[in-house]
Amino acid sequence: MKRTTYAGLVDEKYLNQTVTLSGWVQKRRDFGDLIFVDLRDREGIVQLTFNATHAEALAVAENMRNEYVISVTGQVVRREASQINNKIHSGQIEIDVIEAEILATSKTPPFYIEDNVNANEELKLQYRYLDLRRPEMQKNLRIRSKIMSSAMHFMDQNDFINIETPILAKSTPEGARDYLVPSRIFPGSFYALPQSPQLFKQLLMGSGFDRYFQIARAFRDEDLRGDRQPEFTQMDVETSFMSADEIRELVNAWVKAMMSDVVNFDLDTTKIPTLTWQESMDRFGTDKPDLRIAYELKDVSETVKSSEFGVFAKAVEAGGVVKAIAVPGGAENYSRKDIDKMAQYIERFGAKGLAWLKVTDEGISGPIAKFFPNHAALLQVTGAKPGDLLLFGAGRNDIVAATLDYLRRQTAKDLNLIDMTNPWAFAWIVDWPLFEYSEDFDRWIAAHHPFTMPNEEDLHYLDDGEDPHQAHAQSYDLVLNGYELGSGSIRIHRMDIQEKMLKALGFTPEAAHEAFGFLLEGMTFGFPPMGGIALGLDRLAMLLAGQENIREVIAFPKNSRATEPMTQAPTRVDHKQVNDLGLFVSDVE
């Protein structure tokens, strides 16, 4: 039987027509001489009816079970009024089946194929091909596909050239650990899977292509969390002779087109705010703020530095800060026990406690209220009103920022204070520090990557005798709803500046040329001013699909241990293959 349409597309327009459908049995209800079967395919569900009028088809239906693959031919008829289901597209009609065939049988699945299924995450990953049958997963991956199609169309319309860059590349010290691939032909030598196409796309600009685009796979051997995977996909762009402002305007137009194509949302890009990195950190405690949350961090250091509360006074005296958030309605909704739980959680950020006050019609209450008999100034600075809960952070600026950023996001989630009238809150974060200190590496590293151009007025900081860590960069991040969606910058195109940048990062001239000699030499042949950005496809798909984990928008993802339960990768390989690579693998318990 040749399929004529999808099950989920059949509706009243097909009344009295004969159709042939194929798909999976979602549910079967047997009433003897009348059997109902819900047929599911990628477009949705339609109800099939089998009755004694077509005895052969009824006999086939008697053997059908959940997840059997079937094909049917029948007439589209209107459902009885009591059978109408307005929750599905085909809910007004059903198929009176004339002919039926079972194409494949199925074992009983380890979990039911439906949305909101109560199944262990590892089990769903182990049987990912079953999990992907769920309507929600089908929707998620189609959203991902739409994003890719929209991006490629936009780039084609704007004269970008789609160029693929190597997957087997040279290992370069760009930040995260590389995934290494041993060479059989050159024993002891390794390729690296690229963490990004960064160097290749700069070389393409040096080659004169002017506008490059690629949907690129990238790989990083790093610890995982909900919005990260060891392999990921980015929509990668590089341009020549464009300023940072021009690149951001281009990306705004690109994102506007994608939002329209994928979720039918008319994004007003004129309302996308641009914040400096410092402003974002001061107001929100993070470089990826969720602007749907109205309340912000308020610096109360000057107000409390002379208070009798020693924790605050000592923090300011030691060069730290005291900041607060006023959580609307928090006074009534958080008990002391709730606040104690928050205090325990924020210890992971380095916080040594959580000071708080509840604002009432009479004034303030709480364990530190007695230290602020004249609290009017405190309420004025924080903007707190009766019913609000004031949460404080005191100490080192970075610890206070991380603590209050978490508390701001968590309280907004707890109390439904996220403004859903603004469902897509984009923002640009600009003027980043050129360097940042890494606790992991115990040294200064590039805040974005080593090829980011400093601000023009900060170039002198790279000279000998200057402090390079004072420099800021011509870099920009696009943020959406508290997630970093994309990161970009103007690149260094002159060898003298690039060498100074690498020196500031601790590279000797020999080490710089060992790692990046091909790029440095290329710059001696005249590279144009260039800049670009990479948008994370996985993260964008996650947000547009309304998911909280990027695994839900990747067909075959890894789990939090970077393993893939379905194929059980990574696995040991044949001993001969290892020998051919000139490697020795020690036994590891």
Curated annotation (Swiss-Prot):
**Entry binding sites for ATP:** R220, D221, E222, Q229, E484, G536, L537, D538, R539
The record, for Pfam families, names: GAD, tRNA-synt_2, tRNA_anti-codon
Listed GO CC annotations: cytoplasm
- The residues listed in the UniProt record as binding L-aspartate, with positions renumbered to this chain, are E174, R220, H448, R491
Q: Which residues form a coiled coil?
A: none
Q: Name where it's found.
A: Cytoplasm
Q: Which reaction does it catalyse?
A: tRNA(Asp) + L-aspartate + ATP = L-aspartyl-tRNA(Asp) + AMP + diphosphate
Q: Aspartate: where is this region?
A: 198-201
Entry keyword Ribonucleoprotein: no
* EC identifiers of the protein: 6.1.1.12
InterPro entries, alphabetized: Aa-tRNA-synt_II (IPR004364), aa-tRNA-synth_II (IPR006195), aa-tRNA-synth_II/BPL/LPL (IPR045864), Asp-tRNA-ligase_1 (IPR004524), Asp-tRNA-ligase_1_N (IPR047089), Asp/Asn-tRNA-synth_IIb (IPR002312), AspRS_core (IPR047090), GAD-like_sf (IPR004115)
Note the superkingdom of the native organism: Bacteria
GO BP, sorted A to Z: aspartyl-tRNA aminoacylation
The keyword Aminoacyl-tRNA synthetase is assigned to this record: yes
Alphabetically sorted, this entry's keywords are: Aminoacyl-tRNA synthetase, ATP-binding, Cytoplasm, Ligase, Nucleotide-binding, Protein biosynthesis
Q: Which HAMAP family match?
A: Asp_tRNA_synth_type1
Mind telling me which NCBIfam families this protein's record contains?
Answer: aspS_bact (TIGR00459), PRK00476.1 (NF001750)
Q: What does this protein do?
A: Catalyzes the attachment of L-aspartate to tRNA(Asp) in a two-step reaction: L-aspartate is first activated by ATP to form Asp-AMP and then transferred to the acceptor end of tRNA(Asp).
Q: Which family does it belong to?
A: Belongs to the class-II aminoacyl-tRNA synthetase family. Type 1 subfamily.
Record text on subunit structure and interactions: Homodimer.
Name assigned to this protein: Aspartate--tRNA ligase
